[in-house]
Amino acid sequence: MTAVAPEGRPLLRIEARNAQTPIERKPSWIRTRLRTGPQYQDVKGLVQSAGLHTVCEEAGCPNIYECWEDREATFLIGGEVCTRRCDFCQIDSGRPAPLDHDEPRRVAESVATMGLRYATVTGVARDDLADGGSWLYAETVRQIHARSADTGVEVLIPDFGGRPDQLGEVFEAAPEVLAHNLETVPRIFRRIRPAFRYERSLDVLRQARQAGLVTKSNLILGLGETAEEIHTALRDLRSAGCELLTVTQYLRPTPRHHPVERWVRPEEFLDWGRVGAELGFSGVMSGPLVRSSYRASRLYQQAMTARDQDRSEMSVPPESVSENSHGQRPSPW
């Protein structure tokens, strides 16, 4: 009998091959402590009473306690089915439902109801749409800004096929941070992300930086990459103008997904954080349980501080740079 995926379709060949490897046992350091405070309890109460939906809860994110305590949350837009399949991602692939044009308003109302200081908006790829879903991402940013002027918005986008018009629509909505995740290294990129292209992902970040946006990306470890390849990918990201970086451990969602090639120890994550700083990233979060939206507002503020410092150094005589101190850019969050 042919094996089937939970959504009823036959397993892809790569899924059947992956499923031959049992789910790996997690090491002792892949765990989180339950730490709740008044802000977390308040946000949780608002979410429950209003029937709101966040990626934080529905994906079982281990960082929900910290993020909600900081009044930060992540929302998924565009539906629950992606037109692309990445070998690490738990979101189903297939034919999505029709676009919900009211979704941006509802997300913005959720952000306002929860009293968020910072919201991350991510979503599925919508290659079935003429604009790739760019309007949906842009409109969600606009709606949040309109209802919650003091809330920072980070948008994590697909590559929109690298099309400047679709990317430009999102850029013009002026999110505080434009994120696009590279995720892995060139040698295994096509296997892990067959519908994406390594250079195209770098070009998305390059275009966003040229548009003046704060740029951010993520690299997943444990997919089969080498240390030298990680270093090359980090250099490529910096060369593309990427300012903020998260480095994460791959956690296999189901047996159908890519096996975990190795568990990266916490000390190595610290090393990659130092490498990122040495390469010139304005902010780096690197750890086994870090996710791309983890402590997002803190990273954004680090990027703004670095930009202000750069402007300060450019506006004073070289001999006086070391004598000038510079405070952090004012921020409501």
UniProtKB/Swiss-Prot annotation:
Q: Name one GO cellular component term.
A: cytoplasm
Q: Which organism is it from?
A: Frankia casuarinae (strain DSM 45818 / CECT 9043 / HFP020203 / CcI3)
Q: Could you tell me which pathway this protein works in?
A: Protein modification; protein lipoylation via endogenous pathway; protein N(6)-(lipoyl)lysine from octanoyl-[acyl-carrier-protein]: step 2/2
Q: Where in the cell is it found?
A: Cytoplasm
Please name the gene that encodes this protein: lipA
Show the taxonomic lineage.
Answer: Bacteria, Bacillati, Actinomycetota, Actinomycetes, Frankiales
Q: What is its main location?
A: cytoplasm
Q: How is the cofactor bound?
A: Binds 2 [4Fe-4S] clusters per subunit. One cluster is coordinated with 3 cysteines and an exchangeable S-adenosyl-L-methionine.
Q: What is this protein called?
A: Lipoyl synthase
Q: Where is the composition biased (Low complexity)?
A: 314-325
Q: Provide the residue positions that the database annotates as binding [4Fe-4S] cluster 1.
A: 56, 61, 67, 293
